[in-house]
Amino acid sequence: MLKCFEIQPDCGAVGPVLRWPAGTLQEAGCGLQPDGYPIRHGRGDPSFSVKALKRYQLVDYVSGACLMMRRTDFLEIGGFDPIYSPAYYEDTDLCMRLRGMGKAICLTSRAECYHIENATSHGVESAEWATRQSEKNRLIFMGKWDKILK
């Protein structure tokens, strides 16, 4: 992931391919639909080939589950916006703000992270809570980014 900053000088953030604990593909970077819902590249698609991706692939955002960025950029944009606390869309908003600075968001297809999706929220409440929180924060996100996404 660190090499991406050397190869892609305008890189603002980089993330790895995310896999479920069993090794199946969770996502290879994300796109955004005009309504703010994510497009998790490769998710649920057995024909999707991570090997076919470029080593450093441009994406709309990478998951905060494993995200690397320069400390100076993080401080300059004010870090994660607390309006999204405790979870969901804080990483998406962070990447959008980096993109607004002219920075690229990259997936590095040669790095992998095993991720238990929603593990934190499941421990706090339930899947219903995670869904409600995600939708609440999607609406906040759209209030901020609607014009750009459309």
Where are these regions (language model features)?
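A short, conserved alpha-helix in the catalytic core of glycosyltransferases
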Residues: M1-L2, A52-K54, L58-G78, I83-E112
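Active-site-adjacent helix/loop segment of glycosyltransferases
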Residues: R19-A22, M96-K150
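Short glycine/proline- and charge-enriched loop/turn segments
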Residues: L32-Q33, V50-L53, G78, A119-E128
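Short, flexible, basic/aromatic active-site loop/helix in glycosyltransferases
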Residues: P16, Q33-D60
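Conserved acidic
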Residues: E6, E90, K150
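Conserved donor NDP-sugar-binding/catalytic core segment of glycosyltransferases
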Residues: M1-D35
